[in-house]
Amino acid sequence: MKKYSTNLTDSQWNIINNLLQDKRSRKYKIRDIFDAIFYLLKTGCQWRMLPHCFPPWETVYYYFTVWKHKGIIELIHEHLRDKIRMKAGKDKSPSLGLIDSQSVKTTRSGGICRGIDGGKKTKGRKRHIIVDSLGLLLAVVVHAANEHDSKSATKVIKLLKDRFSRLIKIIADGGYRGEFIENTKTAFGIILEVILRKDDSPKFHVIPKRWVVERTFAWFESYRSLPKP
């Protein structure tokens, strides 16, 4: 098979293969299927436009769908996140999270409904994420762009319940205020710390800690399948 920069290295494949524990003989190699998925993720091509050096697109799509519904992809993601955190000298379970949302224009009509974000004048969808102090994803929710942040933020915070026992604080921007702060503490036992911008400053300033979650959104831009959910 042709080599692409998105192909898994041997060490990367060994990590995934050990998690799958799938020793069955198949017509197409599972590694080649993963390589096809990563190629699509990076280039943003359509399933039907996958290069012929990969397994048939129908096969790749089938496995991707099965792994998604069975939680295999999430399992791999969580395992890799844990490895990175431990390598950085951190506990598997974070004590701090950072939350933010991003409205994205999209013309895709299938799947999640679209809406208009009145504040940003964006028609499409919004993704709400919570990351750890390294910028690694802890939870994500995608919804119509017109859904209020406090409503969708509750959904994404709810995904953390019972998963991260050490999580006690989430840092947010000025869009998360009022009753939402108290409701988050009451419902989930999590403190929401709001860090505001210095509006009186004419120059650009990096907001302490907040840049971490903003950098994660920037990472998404490197993969053409991710900017438009």
Language-model regions, residue ranges each:
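Short alpha-helical elements
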Residues: 1-229
